C-alpha cells in the first residue's frame, strides 16, 4: 500500500462519500485484536511481528462468545452468515482502542477453496468478511477489518503439499502466507478515524471496475464527482450505465492518464484522436 493511500472499511467509505462523516488522518492507532479462544500461536506471532517491525501498538483479547463466519458462494457472488457479532461489540465496548482487527476461521469447504485457487473467480471468503466488518464498524464507529485463520483441514493439506501449485498472480499473496493478519494490522496501524478532517469535498474522482454500481457510485454521482470506469477490469456485476455518464477507460494505465489530465485542467476530448472540430453555436 503506497504512503498516500488510506485504509478504509467499506461502510465507513460509504458514509464518507455520502457526506455523513469526515475522516481524520492519524500517525498511529491503538489496535485491539479479537480472537476466539484460545489465541493461536500464529496469531500471537503475527501481532508480535508487527510490533517488532512496524512499531504497532496492539493487544489481543479472547472472545467470551465464539464468533462464527460461514461463507457462501454461488453464481451471484459471495455472501455468508455471521454469528456472534453483537456479543463481540458488547465485549469490546469495555476496552480503549482506535481500530479493531478481527481474526477467525471462515467456514468454507476445502473444495471451494481449492477451486478458487486453481480456477480463480470470486473470493469465497470476501463476502462474509465484508458483512462482518461492516456490521461491527457500523456499531463501534471505528476502523475495522477481518483476517481469516487457516482451518485444521487446510493445515493438514499444507503438510501433504496439496497447496503447492502455481496460482493467478493476483491471488498469489493469499497462498504464500496462510496467516493473513499482518496486512490487516499494517493497514489499521494508520487507518483514518472518524473525526474532523477530510470530507467528500476533497474527492476529485472515483475509479471503478466495469459493471459495478453501489452506494459509493451513487454518492459520487450526487456530489458531482467524476466516475472513471475501467472496462478491462470486468466483474460478475453487470450494472448498465445508461442513466449516468462515466468516463470510459480501457485499463488502469489509461485511467491514471485521465486523472493526470483532470488534475492539470486539460479537457479530455483535447487529448483524444481524432480531435473534433470546434463547435460554432448558433444564436
Feature-to-residue mapping (PLM):
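A polyampholytic, Gly/Pro-enriched intrinsically disordered region
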Residues: 78-87, 165-174, 246-258
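C-terminal functional extensions of proteins
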Residues: 151-153, 179, 183-205, 209-283
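Gly/Ser/Thr-rich loops at beta-strand to alpha-helix junctions
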Residues: 36-41, 101-110, 121-130, 148-155, ...
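Metallocofactor- and cofactor-centric catalytic cores in central/energy metabolism, strongly enriched
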Residues: 1-102, 107-116, 122, 126
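Low-complexity, flexible helical/coil segments
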Residues: 19, 26-27, 66-71, 134-141, ...
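Predominant activation on well-ordered alpha-helical scaffold segments within soluble catalytic domains
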Residues: 44-48, 130-137, 182, 214, ...
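Structural alpha-beta junctions
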Residues: 48-64, 95, 134-145, 222-229
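Generic multipass alpha-helical transmembrane bundles of integral membrane proteins
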Residues: 73-80, 92-93, 103, 115-191
Amino acid at each position: 500500500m503506497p504512503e498516500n493511500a488510506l485504509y478504509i472499511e467499506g461502510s465507513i467509505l460509504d458514509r464518507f462519500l455520502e457526506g455523513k462523516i469526515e475522516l481524520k488522518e492519524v500517525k498511529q492507532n491503538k489496535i485491539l485484536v479479537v480472537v476466539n479462544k484460545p489465541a493461536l500461536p500464529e496469531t500471537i506471532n503475527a501481532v508480535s511481528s508487527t510490533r517488532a517491525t512496524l512499531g504497532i501498538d496492539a493487544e489481543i483479547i479472547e472472545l467470551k462468545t465464539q464468533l462464527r463466519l460461514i461463507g457462501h458462494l454461488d453464481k451471484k457472488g459471495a455472501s455468508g452468515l455471521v454469528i456472534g457479532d453483537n456479543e463481540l461489540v458488547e465485549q469490546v465496548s469495555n476496552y480503549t482502542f482506535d481500530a479493531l482487527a478481527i481474526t477467525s476461521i471462515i467456514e468454507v469447504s476445502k473444495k471451494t477453496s481449492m477451486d478458487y485457487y486453481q480456477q480463480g473467480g470470486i473470493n469465497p471468503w470476501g463476502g462474509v468478511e465484508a458483512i462482518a466488518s461492516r456490521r461491527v464498524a457500523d456499531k463501534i464507529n471505528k476502523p475495522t477489518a477481518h483476517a481469516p485463520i487457516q482451518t485444521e483441514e487446510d493445515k493438514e493439506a499444507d503438510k501433504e503439499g496439496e497447496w503447492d501449485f502455481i496460482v493467478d498472480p493476483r491471488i498469489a499473496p493469499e497462498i504464500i502466507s496462510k496467516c493473513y493478519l499482518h496486512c490487516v494490522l499494517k493497514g489499521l496501524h494508520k487507518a483514518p478515524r472518524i473525526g474532523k478532517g477530510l470530507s467528500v469535498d476533497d474527492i476529485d474522482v472515483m475509479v471503478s471496475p466495469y459493471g459495478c454500481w453501489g452506494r459509493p457510485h451513487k454518492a459520487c454521482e450526487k456530489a458531482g464527482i467524476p466516475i472513471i470506469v475501467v472496462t478491462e477490469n470486468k466483474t460478475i456485476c453487470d450494472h448498465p450505465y445508461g442513466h449516468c455518464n462515466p468516463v470510459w477507460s480501457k485499463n488502469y494505465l489509461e485511467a491514471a492518464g485521465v486523472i493526470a489530465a483532470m488534475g492539470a485542467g486539460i479537457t479530455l476530448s483535447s487529448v483524444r484522436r481524432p480531435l473534433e472540430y470546434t463547435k460554432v453555436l448558433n444564436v
